[in-house]
Amino acid sequence: MKRTKLLLSLSLLLWVHPLVAAPQGANATEIVTIDAKATAKPFPHFWEEMFGSGRATLTLRDSYRRDMRAVKEITGFQYVRFHDILDDSAGVYSEDKDGNPIYNFSYVDQIYDGLLANGVRPYVELSFMPSKLAATPIVHQPFWYQPIVSPPKDWARWDDLIRHFAQHLIDRYGIEEVSHWYFEVWNEPNIDFWAGDPKQPTYYELYDHTARTLKEVSPRLRVGGPSTAQAAWVDSFIQHDVENKVPVDFISTHVYGNDTAANVFGTNEDIPRDRMVCRAAKKVHDEVLASARPQLPVIFSEYNASYANEPDVTDSIFMGPWLADTIRQCDGLVKMLSYWTFSDVFDEQGVIKKPFYGGFGLVAEGGVPKPSYNAFRLLHMLGTQRIPVNSDSVLATRRADGSLVLVVWNYSAPEQPGTPKEISLQFDGLKGKKHATIYSLDADHGNALAAYAAMGSPVDPTQKQYEELKAAANLPAPEVVRSLAGGKITLTLPAKALKLVVIR
């Protein structure tokens, strides 16, 4: 997880509606007209189908499963991805005194049993290399737990490991279940998570062996890659698979909001954090469409606003507008966006020393929901049909019952204080008396980070302080507007605020 955007064509990112007036000045009210009867398009909730979560053995912790259930409750997510299912910490592979392979799937069973018992399926990242199978003991130094990133010493033994692993899963869970899983080959082989030399051809060798072996076990197993950082290698990867008749069922890659244009696009430009993810998604989307396999689904199996520890980003209310705008822009470009990660039960940089250190998770140390958790809670309430508007601060949807659900935000970069913003929503085509329910996430509502700062940012909060933080994280009861006068409602949004409006 580390990473980099081309301006997305507005014609692909926005449905332009002719009835929306743009603000006329810096402090002018933005008027957005929503046609309640407008033709809508399907709007799958691609941002909440899957989440990332550190490494495999963390799933055995009570705190991990607690946070997983909390996020499952507000999003209904179906898949979880993590590193290290083949690493020594999971105990899958060893050798006897004569060098013969020994397989042990005890931890694998406990890990996957725990996911399935909570209604979550594995998105299996096949990594990292067992020490006894590694060609050289090269480790990924930045990670506290030091995973081995070497190619295997023997390709036949790697194939045998993959074969035994896949067959065990089918024997335990049944092919009807496992055929719904995804198998992704490795993690970010284009950077220092892969020590093959040269990187690309040796990764393709790894992919070829793995994909073919999985399909030998069952053609119903879904396999894909290249799982690269910075949205890299996609066109080359597809070309390689087609030319060499290697199976591939999906494309996976990663990008982060603070990746650089040089790394993602090879250009010398400054791409802002709120544009990077979806410009990268557009790049990959177009590469797949132009390939010999244009129907391959695209999965960004890692993304976030930052790959660094930035409390003012991932712990803050900034994430509400950033997430909403990312969803607006990426709609139609991907099958899934997998947020890295759902929880700060996470140890890539070592054991967590304090809550709110800029971790990636939606839930902070101690089970405290962050503003990003509340943003996902609100975004889950959106409908499954998208109605066109031309505002870049509004996303309008319709539910199956005919109610309208809109999310409205006031974005500013994390390093900028931002200013309040007024948006007037004007509805055409509403029939009968309607009322609005308005949910708010901002500096004063649902913001545990502010409460943490107010108590002096303790390194080791007491249990009482943790309870106070959880209370501060709760979203307040929504405001109810009993009647929409003239079919419109005007919202004042503080800096970095997010509001969700339900019209019934």
State the predicted function of each range:
Residues 1-8:
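Bacterial N-terminal signal peptides that target proteins for export
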Residues 8-18:
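Bacterial N-terminal signal peptides
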Residues 19-182, 197-230, 243-246, 289-295, ...:
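Non-catalytic accessory regions flanking glycosidase/transglycosidase catalytic cores in CAZymes
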Residues 57-58, 86-94, 131, 186-193, ...:
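Conserved radical SAM core fold
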Residues 186-187, 254, 301, 340:
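Alpha/beta-hydrolase-fold catalytic nucleophile elbow
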Residues 189-201, 225-226, 232, 237-241, ...:
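Substrate-binding/catalytic cleft of secreted carbohydrate-active enzymes
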Residues 227-252, 303-322, 326-331, 346-355:
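Substrate-binding cleft/loops of secretory-pathway carbohydrate-active enzymes
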Residues 258-269, 285-320, 349-351, 355-363:
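Active-site clefts of carbohydrate-active enzymes
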